[in-house]
Design a protein with these regions (language model features):
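Helix-loop boundary and gating motifs at the non-cytosolic
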Residues: 2-87, 96, 252-293
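C-terminal transmembrane helical hairpin of 12-TM major facilitator-type secondary transporters
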Residues: 316-362
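Substrate-agnostic recognition of the 12-TM MFS/MFS-like secondary transporter fold
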Residues: 39-57, 77-93, 109-113, 139-223, ...
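Multi-pass alpha-helical transporter architecture, strongest
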Residues: 2, 120, 124, 212-224, ...
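Short hydrophobic/alpha-helical segments at membrane-entry points of transmembrane helices
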Residues: 131-140, 254-256, 343-352
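Flexible cytoplasmic inter-helical loops of multi-pass small-molecule transporters
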Residues: 222-242
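C-terminal ends and interior cores of transmembrane alpha-helices
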Residues: 108-130, 323-341
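Cytoplasmic membrane-interface "Motif A"-like loop-to-helix N-cap segments
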Residues: 97-112, 173, 311-326
Length: 433
């Protein structure tokens, strides 16, 4: 597609006039906005689908169950994914800032993720039991560390190439197209694989995700990025000192990290939705296809709305998402007491869908807020500090499940609702960007 057609498509999608607004990016970068916008959209759509095909919350537990991996290792999937992607970021952000072009710090990690999934696919076909679980967790750890590095670079590249006020729409469009692709994949799983998922299906899902990551890397490599400032390259010790200095002096950064940590209650609650729903309506709830379809529909429904909302006020969006999460959790807590006709697979799927919508809103709002409020020259450090502290919180949050063991699933869900109530109060302290 030539540049004129790209510009027309970009102007139509973003409601941009003849005089393009290029708030917070250079004049040279402004000329490349349409092409870069669509490259990021299609790159993101592929990665969104890949993330759903091999997910610690859906398909990987299925794989572990099929391979006979001990249950204790299954519980380590989400902590390994989150901690692996978040904790190392503070130590590599300075390395990224030492380079004028940051896109390669997304491209190379994406290829590492592709090869990690490729190796995982062959583990699925050739091992089982404890050894399979350990190998997959190891590969997931490598995948997650690469993801963390790419996350830093992505925010920097977006800030350099997409105007402020259009970033939320771009992120939402990625998620929408990815949601459509996910929906198609979920429907196929639900209709074509009725009960047990054989190894060839799981192998195919993992190989497909690997290919999608490789294609996404190729697309991202084509982004036209202007050279950026390279000041600020430091040792990890200096990085820690500077990060701590920012944390101490910037009260808005502290409040944001606290708010983001509390919003983690939304994804943390989702597995307990699955467990409680399965207890109430039977094993049909555990259908991988239903869960994947719910994720796809949620992204299709929520992303366009969330994108425009986040561009208007990502702060208010965080508050709104927390309120939605509270309401949905309270409804789920009441689910066991519903009448026989209401308590079924379809009503549960709807509650799960709302939870996924809320999670999508939480992710988009905090990403947009951080990109918009962080100072340009220190953005990577702000992102790295935020992600590292959230990674530490995730490790702690892995122990929250003891509440469910001691007091039951509904008390566990009420605990998460309390966290979201605190998130609303914390969100009110944030300044507008």
């Amino acid at each position: 597609m030539n540049s004129e057609k790209l510009s027309k498509a970009y102007n139509f999608i973003t409601d941009e006039g003849e005089e393009r607004s290029c708030k917070a990016i250079s004049e040279a970068a402004c000329k490349e906005v349409p092409g870069n916008y669509f490259k990021k959209v299609f790159n993101g759509a592929l990665t969104k689908l890949a993330e759903q095909l091999v997910s610690p919350g859906t398909t990987l537990p299925w794989i572990f169950s099929t391979l006979g991996v001990p249950g204790g290792l299954t519980g380590a999937l989400v902590p390994v994914k989150d901690a692996g992607s978040l904790l190392p970021q503070l130590f590599v952000s300075a390395k990224i800032r030492a380079f004028e072009l940051r896109k390669w710090f997304w491209v190379i990690p994406a290829l590492v993720q592709a090869f990690s999934l490729l190796a995982m696919a062959f583990v699925i076909m050739n091992t089982d039991g404890l050894s399979a679980g350990i190998l997959i967790l190891l590969l997931l750890g490598i995948f997650s560390i690469a993801s963390g590095i790419a996350s830093l670079a992505f925010k920097d590249v977006v800030a350099k190439t997409i105007p402020k006020g259009k970033r939320g729409q771009m992120l939402a469009m990625r998620a929408t197209i990815g949601g459509i692709l996910t929906l198609i994949a979920g429907v196929w799983l639900y209709t074509s694989v009725e009960s047990e998922y054989n190894l060839w299906v799981l192998f195919g899902l993992t190989i497909s995700a690997s290919i999608l990551w490789a294609l996404a890397a190729i697309i991202f490599a084509g982004i036209r990025e202007e050279k950026g400032a390279t000041e600020g390259g430091k040792t990890p010790v200096k990085e820690l000192k500077d990060a701590w200095a920012f944390f101490k002096k910037d009260i808005n950064l502290r409040n944001f990290i606290f708010t983001r940590a509390l919003l983690m209650a939304i994804p943390l609650a989702q597995p307990f939705f699955i467990i409680l729903g399965r207890q109430e309506v039977g094993s049909e709830v555990s259908s991988l296809g239903i869960i994947v379809v719910a994720a796809g529909i949620a992204n299709i429904i929520s992303s366009p709305f969330w994108g425009r909302f986040s561009d208007k006020s990502s702060r208010k969006m965080m508050i709104a998402v927390a309120a939605l999460g509270i309401i949905n959790i309270l409804v789920m807590v009441s689910f066991p007491f519903w009448g026989g006709n209401l308590k079924n697979i379809y009503t549960f799927s709807f509650l799960l869908l709302i939870q996924v919508i809320a999670h999508g809103g939480a992710r988009l709002s905090r990403k947009t807020y951080l990109v918009d409020f962080a100072p340009d020259k220190d953005r990577s450090l702000y992102v790295a500090l935020s992600n590292t502290l959230i990674g530490l919180f995730t490790v702690v949050a892995a122990g929250f499940g003891i509440i469910a063991t001691l007091f039951g699933l509904q008390i566990m869900l009420l605990f998460y609702a309390g966290m979201l109530a605190a998130a609303i109060l914390a969100g009110l302290t944030l300044r507008e960007t």
